[in-house]
Amino acid sequence: MYSIYQASRDQIFTRKYLTMTGAVANPVIVHAPLGASFADCLAMAGGTSLEDYHVLVGGPMMGKLYTKEEAKNLVVTKTTSGFVVLPEDTELIHKKSVPVALSLKLAKTSCIQCSYCTQMCPRYLTGHPLKPHMIMRKLAFCEDPETLLSDKDVQQAMICSECGLCENYACPMGIYPRQVNLYMKGLLRKQGFRYQKPTEPLQQLPEREYRRVSSHRIATRLGVDAYYDYKITECLELQPEQVSIPLSQHIGAPCVPVVVAGQTISEGALVGQMPENSLGARIHASIEGIVTEVTDRFVVIKKGGGQ
């Protein structure tokens, strides 16, 4: 909302408020420039005592998980809402690390067709024709998933929001309808399938109100309840010595760099422009300094030397 407020007043988006939580010394809100590293954000929270850990970018349900090594390359983008440092034995890490091949095998061997994944699916409850249990059922009786791509029930996988409620809470067998949906969506896109929205208005199911799930219960299932009731009282300004600003931070075409190495720029200066006749969003410098590196993927700016 704050970013929308800024945009409505023609203020350039160069900094992001995000949470730095999990297994850290001092959970904080960080006001960070775009392109600031995860390591700099972690330092603002006092670091972590863990030798090995994973980093969750976003929330437990739909966030992306990175290993400690992968996290070395993480930077703040326009869509970063927070970083969560997690111990290696966290249940959430296990669930998000299951290979697709195993998910498909479990769909064939372990699904009991209780239909809880459908009964609790937010899409289904708001009137969409998505029925995850039907997709699981049809996968169980086929050798090649690609033979199902013309099936109407399977095509509904395209409207899965990937919220993960089915596999993180609803399924009593601990299998992975969300990941199966994601896999089928990939096959459908590869085939060139485009989902056609219903022409009639969707009708919310009356039982929707009674099938909502407590976020705290989900956090407990995922093993992250220890970080659920944090009371963060500090908001710290991050002033890094260097930022690495990605040229693709959004849906649409990546930006083309409009600066060169050695150039001195001020905060808010344009560093990336959308290609002609392409949808996207401009990228601006988040700190004042000298451009030290330019590639087709990012622009590195070192603090100092502003004009």
Walk through the language-model features, giving the residues of each:
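Flanking helices and flexible, charged tails adjoining ferredoxin-like Fe-S electron-transfer domains
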Residues: 146-148, 156-257, 263-266, 270, ...
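Generic detector of intrinsically disordered, low-complexity, polar/charged segments
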Residues: 19, 32, 56, 79, ...
